[in-house]
Regions:
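N-terminal secretory signal peptides that target proteins for export/translocation
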Residues: 1-8
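N-terminal periplasmic/intermembrane-space "pro-region" immediately following the signal or transit peptide
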Residues: 2, 13-17, 26-106, 365, ...
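Short secondary-structure boundary/hinge segments and terminal tails
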Residues: 58-59, 156-157, 345
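Short solvent-exposed loop/turn micro-motifs enriched in small/polar/acidic residues
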Residues: 87, 158, 211-213, 317-319, ...
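Outer membrane beta-barrel
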Residues: 90-287, 354-388, 393-410
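Outer-membrane beta-barrel pore domains
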Residues: 121-122, 167, 171, 281, ...
Length: 478
């Protein structure tokens, strides 16, 4: 009996010592330890008095630890209250604690390789190209926002991209902003969507040609509050800056462009199931300056710029352009249709009607969806990024497009060209996109000219040729 009591006392002493040794702040509030004490007292390993003593000590320590933790939290919060927040999730951004200001460096690098079959002609070129190399920053100081970005890919000469300031506001009906500087002309979807998110290496023929990208001007935009479903965007512009030292855009400052774009989602189930429709109008007063010449390559960015050409010289009085667009996102599938037409007033050659259209579609094998935001594409987030248990996002895309400049008479308007029209082409492209992470992408496109005619090339090596090209791109942006 004595041995049994001594054993119990010894066991109790050991338990008390062990508990004292391990009763750190983290363990003092551990429910598992309280359960263990209850088991020991039921088995008689410790007395009721010892049990009460240990439980009370544990609770007291727990309250003391919690108090100390709360004090530490309060001190940290007080110390860091005025310090800026730094976030690095995919992009680096510095912002104030109250959200009144933020600053973010931005940039992108696109490197392209092209392998061409010219079908006996000379319209396209093989090679590699640093397609885009941009650096800049963006941010806000409420209620203002700002952006500045330069591209260094044009033979080493920096060129301005976005350079603007905006005033932001909101009403019960939605959000709005008023922007001044160099920014996108509100016309069409293909040009206004960022190159970071376009599903092909090249935009459609009409977007890389006569559609204005950025000009200097003032514009306003309104976005409805209800699920951001409807928007209106309008502005007045003069020619844009071209190089970092350019002040006037090297063009007539009295040339004016007025444009607007309206659109929205008449069908919206959720962000991955929607239908967008849009309409744009653009009026240019050329004032003796040249019409935005359509001077397009067919397949690659470094090809022959005279494949499709509409040159009015300096005789175009004005021009009107109309654009209709439709976009659908249905889970991993997306589709786009866009049609644009130009009516150019030339007092010597007569009025000319030019047109182009494109239809493209894509599908994510890995289940992602194209991200539609405010009438344009936005970034893709792979469900399982590379390096985090997955292989990124994989997407197949296809596009068929046509540009018809056959109504153009390049012999008129003082133009010395011997051409009778600007040409017409049909091009088909199929592509494969791999998104290892949210900010990186590898692209592979195969493009084929299915039909091509241009009277100016009759009897030459490029007469009715149908070239093809395989292109690849590696891109990163931040």
């Amino acid at each position: 009996m004595l041995k049994q009591l001594n054993f119990k006392n010894l066991l109790a002493s050991i338990m008390l010592g062990v508990f004292a040794a391990i009763s750190t702040p983290a363990m003092a509030t551990n429910e598992a330890m309280l359960d263990l004490l209850e088991i020991l007292v039921k088995k008689g390993s410790i007395t009721e008095g010892e049990y009460e003593l240990l439980v009370n000590a544990s609770k007291a320590d727990g309250e003391n630890v919690e108090h100390n933790i709360n004090e530490m939290k309060a001190k940290v919060a007080k110390t860091t209250k005025k310090m800026p927040k730094i976030t690095t999730k995919g992009k680096f951004k510095v912002a104030s604690q109250d959200g009144t200001w933020e600053w973010q460096p931005i940039g992108r690098i696109f490197w392209d390789s092209m392998y061409v079959d010219n079908d006996g002609g000379t319209l396209e070129d093989n090679g590699e190209e640093l397609r885009r190399a941009r650096l800049g920053f963006q941010g806000k100081v409420k209620p203002m926002s700002y952006k500045l970005e330069l591209d260094f890919a044009n033979s080493g000469t920096p060129s301005w991209k976005d350079v603007w300031l905006a005033y932001n506001g909101k009403t019960d009906a939605g959000k709005w902003w008023l922007k001044i500087g160099q920014h996108h002309v509100p016309f069409g979807h293909a040009t206004i969507s960022s190159s970071k998110y376009m599903t092909m290496m090249r935009r459609p023929l009409f977007a890389d040609g006569p559609q204005l990208s950025r000009n200097v001007g003032i514009a306003g935009r309104f976005q409805s509050k209800a699920k951001n479903r409807w928007f209106a965007h309008a502005g007045v512009f003069v020619p844009g800056l071209s190089t970092a030292s350019d002040e006037t855009g090297q063009a007539a400052t009295d040339r004016r462009t007025t444009a607007f774009r309206v659109g929205g989602t008449p069908y919206y189930k959720d962000k991955n199931h929607l239908l967008h429709v849009g309409f744009s109008y653009q009026h240019e007063e050329h004032k003796g300056d040249a019409f935005s010449n359509i001077d397009n390559t067919l397949l690659t960015h470094i090809g022959n710029g005279d494949s499709l050409e509409a040159n009015f010289g300096t005789n175009a009085d004005d021009s009107d352009a109309f654009d209709i667009e439709a976009i659908t996102v249905m889970g991993p599938f997306h589709g786009i249709f866009e049609y644009v037409t130009w009516d150019v007033s030339d007092p010597i050659g007569g009025d000319v009607d030019l047109s182009a259209w494109a239809i493209d579609a894509g599908y994510f094998f890995t289940g992602e969806s194209m991200k539609y935001k405010y009438g344009a594409w936005s970034g893709i987030k792979p469900k399982k990024p590379l390096g985090k248990g997955g292989l990124g996002a994989w997407q197949i895309t296809a596009r068929y497009e046509n540009m018809d400049l056959s109504d153009m008479d390049n012999t008129g308007g003082g133009n010395t060209s011997t051409a009778d029209d600007g040409g017409e082409a049909d091009v088909f492209t199929i592509g494969l996109n791999w998104y290892p992470t949210s900010n990186t992408r590898i692209m592979a496109d195969y493009s084929k000219v299915l039909d091509f005619s241009h009277v100016d090339l009759a009897g030459t090596a490029n007469d009715a040729v149908e070239p093809a090209a395989f292109q690849m791109r590696a891109q990163v942006y931040w």
